[in-house]
């Protein structure tokens, strides 16, 4: 976590942040495998599986509302829902991110990239 915060600080130290037009939008905060984890036998998993459907894998977007642009940190397996969430709650139209930053090579951080291929985003 400390390495991520240092990376985040270094990345944005030279980028001017203007009040209200740029902000961080949290799209997910669960571990790579999502919530509840596959095969979970704990009580909190078994009680009500559906109540966790809006807990998405860790990802954030840095939004610039003046320019109608954003960058995405992490391309998670939940990227379809996360980009739709940005569409419905931020821009009111579907926009692709200007860039996607992957912080490290765990599967939950890059597997969403597959949705940008011909079989998903490129399909007609």
What residue ranges belong to the model's regions?
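Basic/polar N-terminal segments that are highly enriched at the extreme N-terminus
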Residues: 1-2, 17-20
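Sec-dependent signal peptide recognition
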Residues: 2-10
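Hydrophobic h-region of N-terminal signal peptides that target proteins for export
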Residues: 9-18
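Conserved beta-strand hairpin/beta-sheet module of binuclear metal-dependent hydrolase folds
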Residues: 20-87
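Active-site metal-binding motif and surrounding structural segment of the metallo-beta-lactamase
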Residues: 64, 68-72, 76-124
């Amino acid at each position: 976590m400390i390495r991520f915060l240092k990376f985040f600080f270094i990345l944005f130290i030279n980028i001017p942040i203007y009040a209200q037009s740029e902000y961080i939008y949290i799209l997910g905060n669960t571990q790579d495998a999502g919530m509840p984890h596959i095969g979970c036998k704990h009580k909190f998993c078994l009680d009500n599986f559906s109540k966790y459907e809006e807990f998405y894998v860790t990802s954030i977007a840095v939004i610039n509302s003046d320019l109608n642009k954003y960058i995405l940190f992490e391309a998670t397996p939940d990227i379809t829902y996360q980009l739709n969430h940005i569409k419905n709650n931020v821009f009111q139209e579907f926009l692709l991110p200007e860039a996607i930053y992957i912080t490290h090579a765990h599967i939950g951080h890059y597997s969403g990239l597959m949705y940008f291929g011909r079989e998903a985003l490129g399909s007609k």
